[in-house]
């Protein structure tokens, strides 16, 4: 009797969701800067009214411990410390009556401030 091994592949969801809307806005901002080497760096740092706050910046350098995601030709960088707080999060870009901003929906956050830019775990 022979055993047949089945090769079952399941597609794992991305640990962080980078929406089409966010990628499109980042692409627009990079085009405005005129530097195609720019990548969006998303990070978490201490501060804000809830203990931690999100930050966004452009970076040309990918560090050794960065997680890199690419969506529609746009690269997103997350450092190792921030990654642990962002696993499962969605990074989106919204335009509404309150203005235009990048928004992070983070299932790890137990509380968030009213503006959504700081959180606690």
Curated annotation (Swiss-Prot):
Q: Which HAMAP family match?
A: Fe_S_insert_ErpA (MF_01380)
Q: What does this protein do?
A: Required for insertion of 4Fe-4S clusters.
Subunit structure, as described in the record: Homodimer.
Report the cofactor remark.
Binds 1 iron-sulfur cluster per subunit.
Recorded hits in InterPro entries, A to Z, give: FeS_biogenesis, FeS_cluster_insertion, FeS_cluster_insertion_CS, FeS_cluster_insertion_RrpA, HesB-like_dom_sf
What Gene Ontology biological process does one annotation of this record name?
A: iron-sulfur cluster assembly
Residues engaged in binding iron-sulfur cluster:
49, 113, 115
Q: What is this protein called?
A: Putative iron-sulfur cluster insertion protein ErpA
GO MF assignments: 2 iron, 2 sulfur cluster binding; 4 iron, 4 sulfur cluster binding; iron ion binding
Q: Into which family does the record put it?
A: Belongs to the HesB/IscA family.
Gene3D superfamilies annotated for this entry? Answer: HesB-like domain (2.60.300.12)
Pfam family membership, one: Fe-S_biosyn
């Amino acid at each position: 009797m022979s055993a047949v091994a089945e090769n079952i592949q399941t597609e794992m969801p991305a640990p962080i969701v980078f929406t089409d809307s966010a990628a499109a806005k980042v692409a627009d901002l990079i085009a405005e800067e005129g530097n195609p080497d720019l990548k969006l760096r998303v990070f978490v740092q201490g501060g804000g009214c809830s203990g931690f706050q999100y930050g966004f910046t452009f970076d040309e350098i990918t560090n050794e411990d960065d997680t890199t995601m690419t969506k529609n030709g746009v690269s997103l960088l997350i450092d190792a410390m921030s990654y642990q707080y962002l696993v499962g999060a969605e990074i989106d870009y919204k335009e509404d009556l309150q203005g235009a901003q990048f928004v992070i929906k983070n299932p790890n956050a137990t509380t968030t401030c009213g503006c959504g830019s700081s959180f606690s775990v």
